[in-house]
Amino acid sequence: MLFNANSRAASDITTLFQHFAQGPAADDSAIIKGDKDFNNPNDPNNLSDPKKWKFGSDNRIHAMLNIQSDDPNALSAKVQEQQALANKHGVQQVFLQSGETLPGPLTGHEHFGFKDGISQPAVAGFSPPDPHDPSPDQQAPLGHALGSPGTEIIRAGEFILGESVENDPTFPEQNFPPTFISSLNWMKNGSFQVVRRLNQNVAGFRDGITSALPADGSMNADMLGAKLVGRWKSGTPIDESPDKDTNLTDDARINNFTFANDAQGLRCPRFAHIRKVYPRDHDSFGNRDKRIMRRGIPFGPPFDQDASAERGLFFVAYMESIEGQFDPPPV
């Protein structure tokens, strides 16, 4: 409906934002993210195949409503209110996902046990800079956010359409003809949202770690898990504490570090999750213009409460370009 309402906007969106126009289940997008196997895209045993998604493939959605509250009763009442309003106006609910912070010692952690959401970018114009904490990156003149050591301030255009971006403060006006820009004015101050419902197989993760341990006993399961993630379960960076989990909570160290002294990945492997998604090396391609704003919401009970239940992470992210910031480039 959106495309039919404005054919000019539809053409421009398809040209500039191809993956958004195609949708997440399109072969190009699904293959490069690993949802489909490049060598066997129709594998019936592939649990990540878009055909098995709860939404986003055959169950296309046009909007997502996010309702949050610390009061379960208030939350339930608001959900019912919105459902009634949707029914009144002929809006069909495709899927409802409940999620909440995990209880007890897992508070702030995801189902595999690792502390989540530690490293987030700050946004220029929203987060004041710390005059006493400049970034070591010469390309980051805005420095670190006040009260958040290691949190670099990123230009708002990396998350909000129509604002200046890291590589070109004049974007988009200098890169496209005025007629092109004017047709996209309705998108200004908006953002592209990526939603992924990620199931987590806790038993499989634990078994995989155990089976991969070196036979000589030089590494235990906690250390191998930390090598894969780049942090111990407490959130302590393995670069700061390579031998054991020290439960580091100091803001000046838990996120304020680089891999400058570990170029070969001897402390934090180069394949570690946090190093792949945010290299922290100031000369890395796309280190600043590939940042996204992430929000993770666990769903399902902790594994130790009900091993058979479905569980995972409801991943939500905001960005200026799905192709440029979320989807990896084709190999």
What are these regions (language model features)?
Residues M1-V331:
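Long, low-complexity, Ser/Thr/Gly/Pro-rich intrinsically disordered segments that act as flexible linkers
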